Structures are given as structure tokens and as C-alpha cells.
Design a protein with these regions (language model features):
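Catalytic domains of cell-wall/extracellular-matrix polysaccharide-remodeling enzymes
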Residues: 121, 143-144, 166-290, 295-299
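Active-site beta->alpha N-cap acidic-glycine motif
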Residues: 84-172, 176, 180-197
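Short, well-ordered coil/turn elements that cap or connect secondary structure elements
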Residues: 2, 128-130, 154, 217, ...
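Short, glycine/serine-rich, charged loops/turns that create anion-binding
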Residues: 12, 57, 113-114, 140, ...
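A structural motif
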Residues: 1-83
């Protein structure tokens, strides 16, 4: 990544941790999870030795050592992502429209499938107010904006899978549905180093019992929404910032899942969700609510 430094360290618990520094500052240390392939066999570098760690295209970490004026023959596998647990059985068979809770929590979610015109503003609003959020990314969007996709994950937002090319999945075969999901997952993981599992959002909200079963079989919990802000319709579709705020507040309830978008309306190029977000957050907070990701739903 441009203007970014990644640092990997082994903790006293023998787990691997990652930190990064960009123009915006130091991220702090975050556990990588996964599998330490070399376990405790690799200690601190010896005097006169340098260990170089790189991330491979499969998101694994590989280490090469420079010692006594020469490099080791090849990069050795040091870390690989571990298998994820299966979604909770109680979360299967449903395209969830809200988090099942009586607590006053709201999940802000953002779909990324077109452009990224609103992302900078949305990211600034969320980070400056310390608000967690969930970003549903398509594989196509990640391939178009790899640096921004990495930034989304590195900022700490929860990442979900929104299919590869945003098709109506009920019109596809089971094999095609599988390809849409797995291709997106591969792209997300290789680009960002994080998985989109287990949160999945159907493109257009297009779902039936067959494709719902497909998604569950692939290890995902579908996350729909309680309210669509309709900011994506833009001013050309009759929406305004005030209307976006009103729609979200009118649906306010414990466990509300709000759908917004990172991109602009393709006709008028407005980013109403980004513009409305500060007011939405302030007014929801004023009613005693806090914000969560959908992780409490997906497990």
C-alpha cells in the first residue's frame, strides 16, 4: 500500500499481531487470529539478522531472513488464516431484518457496489464519532478500489460479502450463486486480509428459500435491513438529506439495521447518505441508543 507501513509482532502469548501506520496515524495492535504455522520455533532475530515478512496473494504471511551477507533460499510460510466457526444454528434459515434484541442498539450498514464517492466523508464521520459500522463489499468494487477496500478493513469496520458482481441471485443456478459468493470472498480476503464471513447481503434484497439455503451452506448469515434510507435515489429521485434522516428515525427501534450506500447517485452524483450521516448519528444518540456492527447477529 502507498504511504503505509505494516508491522507484525509475536506477542508473549505466541499469537501474531499487526499494526499499521498511514497518513492518518498509528492503528494500534490487532490480533491476526489464524494459525501460527511456525509456532514458537521462530524467536527474536539474532544479531546481524533481519527477518522480512510479506503478505502473499492468499493473505498468508511469509518470512525470509537475511543473515551473514546472504538471504535464505525462499520465503517460508509463517501464518495462515484459520477456519472460521460455523454460524450459530439459530441464525440460519432467515434473511434478518433486525438484530433480535430489546437493547437500544442500531447497526449502521453501508453497501459498496458502484463507486466510492461518499466513502471519505462517511469514514470521517464514523471515526471522528467512534461509531462502529458494517461495510458490505462486492468483489467488483474491491477490484476497482483495492486501496480503499484495504482502508475500510484497516480502519476496523466489519466487512461483509455483497456478492461478486451484484446480480439477482434468484435468477442464477446454485453453482452460479456459489461462484458469486466465493469469488467475492477470495477477492476481499486477498485484498484486505480479512474475511467477509459470516455476514452476507443479497444484492437488491433478492432472495428466496433456495438461495437462502445456498448462502447458509456456504457459511454465511444473510443480513437484510430494517430501513433503506433511499439516499441512493439522489435528488433526481426526489430524495433530500432531510428525507433520508426522517426515514431512518421513523424506523428507529431496538436492533434496527440501517441500509445506506458508499457511492453516489449515477445521475445527479449526490451522496445523500454521507451528507445525512452526522445528523442521523446525533439524533439516534439523543434518544439513548448506541451503535453496533451486525456481528452480534452473525456470531
Amino acid at each position: 500500500m502507498r504511504a503505509q507501513t505494516l508491522v507484525f509482532v509475536r506477542g508473549t502469548n505466541l499469537q501474531l499481531y499487526r499494526g499499521s501506520r498511514t497518513q492518518t496515524g498509528w492503528s494500534g495492535w490487532a490480533s491476526m487470529g489464524g494459525l501460527l504455522v511456525d509456532a514458537a520455533g521462530v524467536g527474536a532475530p539474532a544479531a546481524g539478522q533481519a527477518d522480512v515478512v510479506v503478505r502473499a496473494t492468499d493473505a498468508s504471511l511469509r518470512t525470509r531472513t537475511y543473515r551473514d551477507g546472504a538471504w535464505s533460499p525462499s520465503y517460508q510460510l509463517s501464518w495462515a488464516a484459520g477456519p472460521l466457526p460455523a454460524p450459530p444454528a439459530g441464525r440460519l434459515g432467515v434473511d434478518w431484518t433486525r438484530i433480535p434484541t430489546s437493547s437500544k442498539v442500531v447497526a449502521l450498514t453501508f453497501d459498496a457496489g458502484s463507486d466510492a464517492a461518499g466513502l471519505a466523508s462517511i469514514r470521517t464521520t464514523l471515526t471522528s464519532r467512534n461509531i462502529p459500522a458494517t461495510m458490505f463489499l462486492t468483489g467488483a468494487w474491491v477490484r476497482s478500489y483495492p486501496a480503499l477496500a484495504y482502508q475500510v478493513a484497516d480502519t476496523g469496520f466489519l466487512v461483509g460479502n455483497h456478492s461478486d458482481t451484484h446480480l439477482y441471485l434468484t435468477q442464477r443456478t446454485d453453482a452460479q450463486v456459489t461462484a458469486q459468493v466465493t469469488n467475492a470472498e477470495t477477492t476481499i480476503f486477498r485484498t484486505t486480509g480479512v474475511t467477509g464471513k459470516p455476514a452476507f447481503r443479497f444484492p437488491y434484497g433478492d432472495v428466496n428459500a433456495r438461495v437462502l439455503a445456498d448462502i447458509n451452506r456456504l457459511g454465511y448469515v444473510p443480513v437484510r435491513w430494517t430501513v433503506d434510507s433511499l439516499g441512493w435515489q439522489g435528488t433526481s429521485g426526489g430524495m433530500t438529506t432531510a428525507k433520508v434522516v426522517s426515514r431512518v428515525l421513523a424506523a428507529l427501534q431496538p436492533g434496527e439495521i440501517v441500509l445506506m450506500h458508499l457511492g453516489a447517485n449515477p445521475t445527479d452524483h449526490t451522496t445523500l447518505d454521507a451528507a445525512a450521516l452526522p445528523t442521523i448519528i446525533d439524533r439516534i444518540r439523543a434518544q439513548g441508543y448506541t451503535f453496533v456492527t451486525v456481528q452480534s447477529l452473525t456470531g
